Amino acid sequence: MHNVSLTIFANFKIDNEERYLRMKDSFISFKDIPAERWVINIRGSYKSDTFDFLKKHLGEKLYHYDLQSSNGWFHDTRVMLKDINSEYIFFWIEDHINMADVTIYDNILKDMCENKVEHFIYSWWHKSVLNKYEYINKKETNNINIYNLSDSNIRIIEKRIGTYFMPISAVSISTNMFFRKIVTSNHPKLKRWPRETPFDFEKRSSDFEFFPFVLSFPKFELFANIDDNHGTVGYSLIDRGLYENRMTRDEIKSIEFRKSFNYYRLIKPIFPNVIWKLLVSISDYIRRLVYTYG
Protein backbone atom coordinates (compact mmCIF):
# COMPACT_ATOMS: atom_id res chain seq x y z
CA MET A 1 0.00 0.00 0.00
CA HIS A 2 1.17 3.56 -0.73
CA ASN A 3 2.24 5.91 2.04
CA VAL A 4 -0.80 7.91 3.14
CA SER A 5 -0.24 11.67 2.92
CA LEU A 6 -0.94 13.86 5.95
CA THR A 7 -1.05 17.59 6.70
CA ILE A 8 -1.06 19.05 10.19
CA PHE A 9 -3.53 21.94 10.35
CA ALA A 10 -3.95 24.50 13.12
CA ASN A 11 -5.62 27.88 13.37
CA PHE A 12 -5.05 28.82 16.97
CA LYS A 13 -4.75 31.81 19.27
CA ILE A 14 -1.71 31.87 21.55
CA ASP A 15 -2.40 34.85 23.78
CA ASN A 16 -0.58 34.22 27.07
CA GLU A 17 2.57 32.56 28.35
CA GLU A 18 0.83 29.47 29.71
CA ARG A 19 -0.94 28.83 26.40
CA TYR A 20 2.42 29.28 24.64
CA LEU A 21 4.18 26.80 26.94
CA ARG A 22 1.42 24.24 26.46
CA MET A 23 1.57 24.67 22.69
CA LYS A 24 5.31 23.93 22.78
CA ASP A 25 4.80 20.82 24.91
CA SER A 26 2.04 19.61 22.62
CA PHE A 27 4.20 20.14 19.54
CA ILE A 28 7.21 18.35 20.99
CA SER A 29 5.03 15.38 21.91
CA PHE A 30 4.20 14.56 18.26
CA LYS A 31 6.58 16.61 16.09
CA ASP A 32 7.97 13.50 14.38
CA ILE A 33 4.59 12.35 13.08
CA PRO A 34 4.88 11.53 9.33
CA ALA A 35 3.36 14.74 7.97
CA GLU A 36 4.39 16.45 4.74
CA ARG A 37 3.25 19.92 5.77
CA TRP A 38 2.25 21.89 8.82
CA VAL A 39 -0.25 24.54 7.69
CA ILE A 40 -0.58 26.85 10.67
CA ASN A 41 -2.36 30.16 11.28
CA ILE A 42 -1.22 31.89 14.47
CA ARG A 43 -3.18 34.61 16.26
CA GLY A 44 -2.68 36.33 19.59
CA SER A 45 0.01 38.30 21.38
CA TYR A 46 2.43 35.34 21.34
CA LYS A 47 2.16 34.75 17.59
CA SER A 48 5.73 35.91 16.86
CA ASP A 49 7.19 33.66 19.55
CA THR A 50 5.07 30.78 18.29
CA PHE A 51 6.16 31.32 14.70
CA ASP A 52 9.84 31.45 15.67
CA PHE A 53 9.50 28.24 17.67
CA LEU A 54 7.68 26.33 14.92
CA LYS A 55 9.95 27.64 12.16
CA LYS A 56 13.02 26.53 14.10
CA HIS A 57 11.70 22.97 14.37
CA LEU A 58 9.85 22.59 11.07
CA GLY A 59 11.82 24.66 8.57
CA GLU A 60 10.35 24.35 5.08
CA LYS A 61 7.56 22.07 6.31
CA LEU A 62 5.89 25.08 7.95
CA TYR A 63 3.30 26.91 5.82
CA HIS A 64 2.65 29.93 7.97
CA TYR A 65 -0.38 32.24 7.96
CA ASP A 66 -1.00 35.45 9.85
CA LEU A 67 -4.77 35.81 9.45
CA GLN A 68 -7.27 37.36 11.82
CA SER A 69 -10.02 38.81 9.68
CA SER A 70 -13.30 40.18 10.99
CA ASN A 71 -15.03 37.39 9.04
CA GLY A 72 -13.88 34.85 11.59
CA TRP A 73 -12.17 31.51 12.05
CA PHE A 74 -13.97 29.61 9.30
CA HIS A 75 -13.31 32.28 6.69
CA ASP A 76 -9.61 32.34 7.53
CA THR A 77 -9.43 28.54 7.52
CA ARG A 78 -10.92 28.43 4.03
CA VAL A 79 -8.11 30.74 2.86
CA MET A 80 -5.61 28.17 4.15
CA LEU A 81 -7.11 25.28 2.18
CA LYS A 82 -5.09 26.16 -0.92
CA ASP A 83 -1.97 24.78 0.80
CA ILE A 84 -3.61 21.53 1.90
CA ASN A 85 -3.68 18.79 -0.72
CA SER A 86 -2.96 15.67 1.36
CA GLU A 87 -5.32 12.73 1.72
CA TYR A 88 -5.77 13.34 5.45
CA ILE A 89 -5.77 16.40 7.70
CA PHE A 90 -4.75 16.30 11.35
CA PHE A 91 -6.52 19.10 13.26
CA TRP A 92 -4.00 20.08 15.94
CA ILE A 93 -5.44 21.41 19.20
CA GLU A 94 -2.59 22.84 21.24
CA ASP A 95 -3.71 21.80 24.73
CA HIS A 96 -3.66 18.08 23.98
CA ILE A 97 -0.48 16.03 24.49
CA ASN A 98 0.52 12.94 22.54
CA MET A 99 1.09 9.93 24.83
CA ALA A 100 2.00 7.37 22.16
CA ASP A 101 5.00 6.45 20.03
CA VAL A 102 4.54 8.51 16.86
CA THR A 103 5.43 5.53 14.67
CA ILE A 104 1.94 4.14 15.38
CA TYR A 105 0.33 6.88 13.28
CA ASP A 106 1.58 5.31 10.04
CA ASN A 107 -0.39 2.17 10.86
CA ILE A 108 -3.44 4.15 11.96
CA LEU A 109 -3.47 6.14 8.72
CA LYS A 110 -3.17 2.95 6.68
CA ASP A 111 -6.07 1.41 8.62
CA MET A 112 -8.13 4.52 8.01
CA CYS A 113 -7.40 4.48 4.30
CA GLU A 114 -8.08 0.75 3.85
CA ASN A 115 -11.40 1.01 5.71
CA LYS A 116 -12.50 4.33 4.19
CA VAL A 117 -12.60 6.07 7.57
CA GLU A 118 -13.58 9.72 7.14
CA HIS A 119 -13.19 11.00 10.70
CA PHE A 120 -10.92 9.68 13.47
CA ILE A 121 -11.08 11.17 16.98
CA TYR A 122 -7.58 11.02 18.45
CA SER A 123 -8.21 12.37 21.95
CA TRP A 124 -10.89 12.37 24.70
CA TRP A 125 -10.22 8.64 25.10
CA HIS A 126 -12.40 7.78 28.09
CA LYS A 127 -15.53 5.78 28.82
CA SER A 128 -18.07 8.60 28.73
CA VAL A 129 -17.16 9.13 25.05
CA LEU A 130 -16.37 5.60 23.93
CA ASN A 131 -19.25 3.80 25.66
CA LYS A 132 -21.82 5.66 23.53
CA TYR A 133 -20.82 3.52 20.57
CA GLU A 134 -21.19 0.14 22.27
CA TYR A 135 -24.83 0.02 21.10
CA ILE A 136 -23.94 -0.31 17.41
CA ASN A 137 -21.84 -2.78 15.44
CA LYS A 138 -18.16 -2.08 14.87
CA LYS A 139 -15.35 -3.24 12.66
CA GLU A 140 -11.88 -3.64 14.16
CA THR A 141 -8.23 -3.53 13.17
CA ASN A 142 -5.28 -3.89 15.52
CA ASN A 143 -5.32 -0.13 16.06
CA ILE A 144 -8.81 1.28 15.62
CA ASN A 145 -12.52 0.59 16.11
CA ILE A 146 -14.67 1.62 13.15
CA TYR A 147 -18.34 2.63 13.16
CA ASN A 148 -20.81 3.39 10.40
CA LEU A 149 -22.58 6.58 11.52
CA SER A 150 -25.74 6.00 9.50
CA ASP A 151 -29.02 7.70 10.36
CA SER A 152 -30.33 4.49 11.92
CA ASN A 153 -27.21 3.97 14.05
CA ILE A 154 -27.35 7.57 15.24
CA ARG A 155 -30.98 7.08 16.30
CA ILE A 156 -30.04 3.88 18.16
CA ILE A 157 -27.35 5.68 20.15
CA GLU A 158 -29.55 8.71 20.89
CA LYS A 159 -32.37 6.47 22.11
CA ARG A 160 -30.04 4.56 24.43
CA ILE A 161 -28.28 7.60 25.93
CA GLY A 162 -31.36 9.85 25.93
CA THR A 163 -29.84 12.85 24.17
CA TYR A 164 -27.74 13.95 21.21
CA PHE A 165 -23.99 13.33 21.17
CA MET A 166 -20.94 14.81 19.43
CA PRO A 167 -19.52 12.47 16.76
CA ILE A 168 -17.56 15.19 14.92
CA SER A 169 -14.71 16.62 16.95
CA ALA A 170 -11.92 19.13 16.48
CA VAL A 171 -9.39 16.67 17.94
CA SER A 172 -9.47 14.59 14.80
CA ILE A 173 -7.88 13.30 11.65
CA SER A 174 -10.26 13.66 8.71
CA THR A 175 -10.16 12.95 5.02
CA ASN A 176 -9.46 16.07 3.00
CA MET A 177 -12.96 15.93 1.57
CA PHE A 178 -14.68 15.56 4.94
CA PHE A 179 -12.64 18.37 6.50
CA ARG A 180 -13.50 20.68 3.59
CA LYS A 181 -17.17 19.74 3.84
CA ILE A 182 -17.20 20.99 7.43
CA VAL A 183 -15.23 24.22 7.00
CA THR A 184 -16.95 25.26 3.76
CA SER A 185 -20.47 24.69 5.06
CA ASN A 186 -22.44 27.51 6.61
CA HIS A 187 -23.58 25.25 9.41
CA PRO A 188 -25.18 25.99 11.75
CA LYS A 189 -26.90 28.97 10.19
CA LEU A 190 -27.43 30.37 13.69
CA LYS A 191 -23.93 30.09 15.13
CA ARG A 192 -23.51 28.38 18.48
CA TRP A 193 -20.16 30.05 19.18
CA PRO A 194 -18.44 33.38 18.44
CA ARG A 195 -17.17 33.62 14.86
CA GLU A 196 -13.54 34.04 15.95
CA THR A 197 -13.54 30.58 17.58
CA PRO A 198 -13.32 27.10 15.99
CA PHE A 199 -15.97 25.46 18.15
CA ASP A 200 -18.68 25.24 15.47
CA PHE A 201 -16.40 22.75 13.69
CA GLU A 202 -17.74 20.19 16.16
CA LYS A 203 -21.12 18.72 15.19
CA ARG A 204 -24.01 17.13 17.02
CA SER A 205 -25.70 13.90 16.05
CA SER A 206 -28.71 16.07 15.15
CA ASP A 207 -26.72 17.94 12.48
CA PHE A 208 -28.06 15.71 9.71
CA GLU A 209 -26.26 17.23 6.72
CA PHE A 210 -22.94 15.64 7.76
CA PHE A 211 -24.23 12.06 7.92
CA PRO A 212 -23.73 9.28 7.11
CA PHE A 213 -19.97 8.90 7.49
CA VAL A 214 -17.41 6.39 8.77
CA LEU A 215 -16.05 7.22 12.23
CA SER A 216 -13.26 5.61 14.20
CA PHE A 217 -11.50 5.74 17.56
CA PRO A 218 -8.12 4.36 18.64
CA LYS A 219 -8.07 1.12 20.64
CA PHE A 220 -5.57 2.71 23.04
CA GLU A 221 -4.91 6.21 24.27
CA LEU A 222 -3.06 8.53 21.89
CA PHE A 223 -3.59 12.11 23.08
CA ALA A 224 -5.02 13.52 26.31
CA ASN A 225 -6.02 17.00 27.37
CA ILE A 226 -3.80 18.93 29.76
CA ASP A 227 -6.40 20.41 32.13
CA ASP A 228 -9.91 19.53 30.95
CA ASN A 229 -11.48 16.47 32.58
CA HIS A 230 -14.18 16.47 29.89
CA GLY A 231 -16.80 15.37 32.40
CA THR A 232 -14.72 12.45 33.66
CA VAL A 233 -13.08 12.95 37.05
CA GLY A 234 -9.34 12.36 36.92
CA TYR A 235 -9.06 12.30 33.12
CA SER A 236 -6.83 15.34 32.50
CA LEU A 237 -3.06 15.04 32.53
CA ILE A 238 -2.84 17.49 35.41
CA ASP A 239 -5.26 15.43 37.50
CA ARG A 240 -3.25 12.30 36.69
CA GLY A 241 -0.09 14.03 37.89
CA LEU A 242 1.43 13.81 34.40
CA TYR A 243 1.66 17.54 33.69
CA GLU A 244 2.82 20.44 35.81
CA ASN A 245 -0.05 22.50 37.21
CA ARG A 246 1.42 25.95 36.59
CA MET A 247 -2.00 27.55 36.13
CA THR A 248 -5.49 26.19 36.72
CA ARG A 249 -8.07 25.89 33.97
CA ASP A 250 -10.22 28.56 35.62
CA GLU A 251 -7.26 30.94 35.79
CA ILE A 252 -6.54 30.51 32.09
CA LYS A 253 -10.20 31.01 31.16
CA SER A 254 -10.40 34.17 33.28
CA ILE A 255 -7.45 35.58 31.32
CA GLU A 256 -8.64 34.52 27.88
CA PHE A 257 -12.34 35.23 28.22
CA ARG A 258 -12.18 37.96 30.86
CA LYS A 259 -14.70 36.12 33.01
CA SER A 260 -14.38 36.52 36.74
CA PHE A 261 -17.91 35.84 37.95
CA ASN A 262 -20.82 33.66 36.88
CA TYR A 263 -23.91 35.85 37.29
CA TYR A 264 -26.20 32.97 36.31
CA ARG A 265 -25.44 31.29 39.64
CA LEU A 266 -26.48 34.44 41.46
CA ILE A 267 -29.83 35.02 39.76
CA LYS A 268 -30.98 31.43 39.08
CA PRO A 269 -32.46 30.86 42.60
CA ILE A 270 -34.73 33.89 42.12
CA PHE A 271 -36.85 32.24 39.39
CA PRO A 272 -39.08 29.14 39.34
CA ASN A 273 -37.54 26.33 37.29
CA VAL A 274 -40.02 26.63 34.39
CA ILE A 275 -39.43 30.38 34.09
CA TRP A 276 -35.67 29.89 34.37
CA LYS A 277 -35.63 27.37 31.49
CA LEU A 278 -37.65 29.78 29.34
CA LEU A 279 -35.28 32.65 30.12
CA VAL A 280 -32.26 30.47 29.31
CA SER A 281 -33.82 29.49 25.96
CA ILE A 282 -34.51 33.12 25.07
CA SER A 283 -31.02 34.14 26.16
CA ASP A 284 -29.47 31.35 24.10
CA TYR A 285 -31.42 32.38 21.00
CA ILE A 286 -30.39 36.04 21.37
CA ARG A 287 -26.78 34.99 21.93
CA ARG A 288 -26.78 32.95 18.73
CA LEU A 289 -28.27 35.85 16.80
CA VAL A 290 -25.43 38.05 18.03
CA TYR A 291 -22.82 35.42 17.09
CA THR A 292 -24.32 35.17 13.61
CA TYR A 293 -25.16 38.77 12.72
CA GLY A 294 -23.33 40.89 15.29
Roles of regions detected by a PLM:
Residues 6-16:
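A conserved hydrophobic helix/loop-capping motif in glycosyltransferases and polysaccharide synthases
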Residues 15-31:
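Short, well-formed alpha-helical segments that are part of the catalytic scaffolds
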Residues 19, 171-177, 181-294:
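C-terminal catalytic/acceptor-binding lobe
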Residues 27-64:
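Acidic donor-binding segment of Leloir-type glycosyltransferases
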Residues 78-88:
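Active-site nucleotide-sugar/metal-binding loop of Leloir-type enzymes
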Residues 87-97:
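Short beta-strand-to-loop acidic/aromatic patch adjacent to the donor-nucleotide binding site
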Residues 100-128:
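Conserved donor-nucleotide/metal-binding helix-loop-beta segment in metal-dependent transferases, i.e.
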Residues 153-174:
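A recurrent flexible, glycine/aromatic-enriched loop bordering the glycosyltransferase active site
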